[in-house]
């Protein structure tokens, strides 16, 4: 097997748990409710925080990869993903599990752009690169589809933390393989990181989602729910204005 396809296998191996973790807890709500004494609202955050934080962090992590090189970003993201998985598996309360899932999302947000950059730098020929990207997309959709199945099997035979603990040996193997196989990509120091804008975007998303969930459940006073929603909308508006005025925006708003 050529080095190109070995590199692709290593990249896909690290991407599998990232995709699975997006949906692996969808069947675990009853188990988590009993084991951690989680409320309905806490269960929603345990499940949703991963996708919400990852969505907000992918773009700045891509910029970070430009600064430090995407191989380093891949190894750093894998290490954070493994540590967060261990913390999640050992979480004693719902709040610590939510925090661990948020950290897990940060690691995942590093891995996603790093894998795409690795594919782009590994396959110079367009037809091979397109095939590699197709396999990457298939692994992502397949991992998300099989997440509930994997979660159900593990919960049937082991304790709830096993859905996270299984990531740890995978990450250790992946780090060893990728450190040796994946080529180093050159860093581009001039790429702005815009971490503040990324944090504002995440805060805006979380506030808007929180206000929507609170409105549906009636947990907060209507005026307070509206205030949180307005705060989230104001932050989102500020983020969009910054992107429109930036010379090198994280998101090119003209595409929408």
Region spans (language model):
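Residue-level signature of mid-helix packing/kink "hotspots" within the transmembrane helices
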Residues: 23, 54-59, 144-145
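Primarily residues marking transmembrane-helix entry/exit sites
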Residues: 1-12, 94, 194-199, 203, ...
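Hydrophobic residues within membrane-embedded alpha-helical segments of Major Facilitator Superfamily
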Residues: 13, 17, 24-29, 58, ...
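Small-residue-mediated transmembrane helix hinge/kink sites in multi-pass secondary transporters
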Residues: 30, 62-63, 116, 151-152, ...
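Extracytoplasmic
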Residues: 3-51, 111-112, 116
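Helix-loop-helix hairpins in multi-pass membrane proteins, especially solute transporters
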Residues: 66, 70-196
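Hydrophobic transmembrane-helix bundles of small-molecule transporters
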Residues: 156-255
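Short helix-kink/termination motifs in transmembrane helices of multi-pass secondary transporters
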Residues: 14-28, 53, 70, 163, ...
């Amino acid at each position: 097997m050529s080095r190109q396809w070995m590199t692709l296998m290593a990249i896909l191996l690290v991407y599998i748990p990232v995709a699975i973790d997006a949906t692996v807890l969808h069947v675990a709500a009853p188990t988590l409710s009993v084991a951690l004494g989680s409320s309905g609202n806490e269960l929603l955050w345990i499940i949703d925080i991963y996708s919400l934080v990852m969505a907000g962090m992918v773009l700045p992590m891509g910029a970070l990869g430009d600064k430090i090189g995407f191989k380093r970003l891949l190894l750093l993201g894998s290490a954070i993903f493994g540590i967060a998985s261990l913390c999640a598996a050992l979480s004693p309360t719902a709040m610590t599990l939510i925090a661990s899932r948020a950290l897990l999302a940060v690691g995942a947000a590093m891995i996603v752009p790093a894998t795409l950059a690795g594919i782009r730098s590994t396959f110079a020929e367009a037809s091979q690169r397109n095939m590699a990207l197709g396999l990457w997309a298939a692994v992502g959709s397949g991992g998300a589809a099989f997440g509930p199945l994997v979660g159900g099997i593990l919960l049937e035979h082991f304790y709830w933390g096993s859905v996270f603990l299984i990531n740890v040996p995978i990450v250790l193997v992946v780090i060893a393989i990728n450190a040796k196989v994946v080529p180093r990509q050159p860093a581009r120091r001039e790429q702005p990181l815009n971490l503040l804008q990324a944090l504002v975007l995440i805060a805006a998303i979380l506030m808007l989602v929180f206000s929507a969930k609170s409105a549906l459940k009636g947990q907060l006073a209507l005026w307070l729910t509206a205030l949180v929603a307005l705060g989230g909308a104001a932050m989102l508006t500020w983020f969009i204005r910054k992107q429109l005025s930036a010379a090198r925006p994280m998101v090119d708003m003209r595409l929408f």
